[in-house]
């Protein structure tokens, strides 16, 4: 099952966008093979944070994370950032060695900033490169904007769902923008 060509996809939900004041409240990972077939879903973790921090979120985050049920899950969670980091690393070790997979996702630089600050061991597990689907999106918007009509995203702002959206978005770009044929699962 371990293959250093596998890709690690990660998404974080945070209380805001500033690592100096905001915190991670949910994280999830998925491992795919190089052809983007899902091999395994990692733990989906609501990270315990104090109510005072959640109460200080801006209006958008407050509305979004309350409507999704994430605030309730965070308040009920007893999993610390450190525990979430270790659970995730233990999962990833089964599928890819440290330093081999780029960090994969959408706007992944933002997630990397929070990992550097709050989960440095997990940040170091990734290769320094990124596979950022949002880079392709920016090119499509500029070069082939008509293709954006075919991108279907649920945008639930829940970590696992967002990763699946990112994988499906990359598959769409592979077929319609990069023009590679659909790759069948070899399993």
Curated annotation (Swiss-Prot):
Database matches in InterPro entries: Exonuclease_RNaseT/DNA_pol3, Oligoribonuclease, RNaseH-like_sf, RNaseH_sf
In its UniProt record, which GO terms are filed under biological process? DNA metabolic process
A Pfam family annotated for this UniProt entry: RNase_T
The answer to keyword Transferase applying to this record is: no
- Keywords on record: Cytoplasm, Exonuclease, Hydrolase, Nuclease
Q: Which CDD domains match?
A: Orn
Q: What is its main location?
A: cytoplasm
Q: What is its EC number?
A: 3.1.15.-
Where's it found, cell-wise?
Answer: Cytoplasm
Broad enzyme group: hydrolase
User: What family does the entry list?
Assistant: Belongs to the oligoribonuclease family.
HAMAP family found in the cross-reference section: Oligoribonuclease (MF_00045)
Q: What is the name of this protein?
A: Oligoribonuclease
Instruction: Please tell me the species this chain comes from.
Output: Legionella pneumophila subsp. pneumophila (strain Philadelphia 1 / ATCC 33152 / DSM 7513)
